[in-house]
Curated annotation (Swiss-Prot):
Name this polypeptide is given: Dimethylsulfoniopropionate lyase 2
Induction per the UniProt record: Expressed at low level.
Task of the protein: Mediates cleavage of dimethylsulfoniopropionate (DMSP) into dimethyl sulfide (DMS) and acrylate. DMS is the principal form by which sulfur is transported from oceans to the atmosphere and is a key component of the ocean sulfur cycle.
Keyword DNA-binding applies: no
Lineage of the organism: Eukaryota, Haptista, Haptophyta, Prymnesiophyceae, Isochrysidales
UniProt KW Cell division keyword: no
MF terms (GO), sorted A to Z: dimethylpropiothetin dethiomethylase activity
Gene: ALMA2
């Protein structure tokens, strides 16, 4: 790369929130800057700030594992969380109106996440979908004009995913308790209506449109599959001390899902509702050979809206922003341009100041 342009980028990177390392391999190894996660690799090129995911937690403690939405190892970006005191798993599962003090705690938890810099908010329990509308609109109001997308449950993905399956296909919705999830079908509409009325008193017009959570589990394109019969998983959920070896659980869940898919070959994808089952999505993929979406998928999906486009596009442009990336002039093994014509153009440098 040209030395003048390289120096300019380095000077500007120094003033960014995340320091940049030299881009050549030898210098990068010697660079003392600590790169906390994969996003910092993007920041090396673009000087972008780190994205932050806010996790709204119910009042329930459990041992996190790789693949859980509360485990920092599940993501390559920053994670902050806030617990809604009084919103127990039982209350979340029932979906009944919350006591005033719990609603106040819910407001406080959302504020805490936004104040901590959360770019978007997800939940650690699928039953938080009952409060999807309320939290979505309250967060937007409190954020004061700053976009803060909210997706509290992987169930919000159920309708968009229907567009991806072929005619006659089904999405298997995996949940810890089939009975509890089916009850949601009857309650969700009335709960949403109550939240809309509450939100109107707060002068949040967006609450009139409860988009994204009108879920109909009686739709023949959905097949609700409960993990009630997977004994090792039920034991793990009930064990407050956690589970040290999850391999036996993963194998049992994978075998169970494979059996269900064999009995109903119309299933062509899985959507995991239960947050604690999300850590076994890899086993379900291997066992069934089908794509799997889970609570972690939500976090990664929303994060891309804040991190992906600028670096990948800008790095393919030259000084004027018009020169396309020539594969023959690129070190593919390192995944980064090596020629001077692939520098950031001045218009992009100005954007990153």
């Amino acid at each position: 790369m040209g030395s003048a342009s390289s120096k300019t980028r380095k000077d500007k990177a120094k003033s960014s929130t995340i320091a940049a390392c030299p881009t050549d391999t030898a210098a990068a190894k010697a660079c003392p800057t600590r790169l906390d996660d994969g996003l910092a690799q993007v920041a090396m090129f673009a000087g972008l700030r780190q994205v932050t995911m806010g996790v709204l937690r119910i009042d329930y403690d459990y041992q996190t594992n790789l693949g859980d939405i509360l485990d920092p190892r599940s993501f390559d970006f920053r994670l902050v969380s806030a617990t809604v005191e009084g919103l127990t798993f039982k209350r979340a599962q029932e979906g009944e109106p919350l006591p005033c003090y719990v609603m106040s705690n819910l407001d406080g938890a959302v504020k805490k996440l936004i104040d901590a810099g959360a770019d978007f908010i997800v939940g650690d329990c699928g039953f938080l979908v009952y409060w999807q509308v309320y939290v979505r609109d309250f967060a937007q109001q409190y954020a004061g004009g700053r976009a803060c997308p909210v997706m509290l449950s992987s169930l919000v993905l159920s309708l968009p995913l229907l567009a991806t399956i072929p005619v006659g296909g089904k999405i298997g919705i995996l949940t810890a308790s089939k009975g509890s999830l089916m009850k949601m079908q009857k309650k969700l509409a009335s709960v949403i209506e109550l939240q809309k009325e509450e939100a109107r008193t707060r002068a949040v017009p967006a609450a009139v449109q409860p988009s994204g959570i009108e879920i109909n589990f009686s739709d023949p394109r959905f097949k609700v599959v409960g993990l009630d019969t997977v004994n090792s998983f039920k034991t793990a959920l009930a064990d407050d001390s956690g589970v040290d070896d999850r391999r036996s659980i993963a194998i049992e869940i994978a075998k169970y899902c494979k059996q269900v898919a064999c009995e109903d070959p119309a299933i062509c994808a899985w959507l995991i509702e239960c947050t604690e089952a999300g850590g076994f999505s890899w086993a379900i993929k291997l066992g069934t050979g089908l794509p799997v979406w889970d609570p972690v998928t939500i976090g990664r999906f929303l994060s891309l809206g804040f991190t992906s486009s600028l670096p990948s596009v800008a790095l393919t442009l030259g000084e004027t922003g018009q020169v396309a990336l020539d594969p023959n002039e690129t070190d593919v093994s390192k995944g980064r341009p090596t020629k001077a014509e692939h520098r950031f153009g001045p218009e992009f440098e100005e954007m990153l100041q």
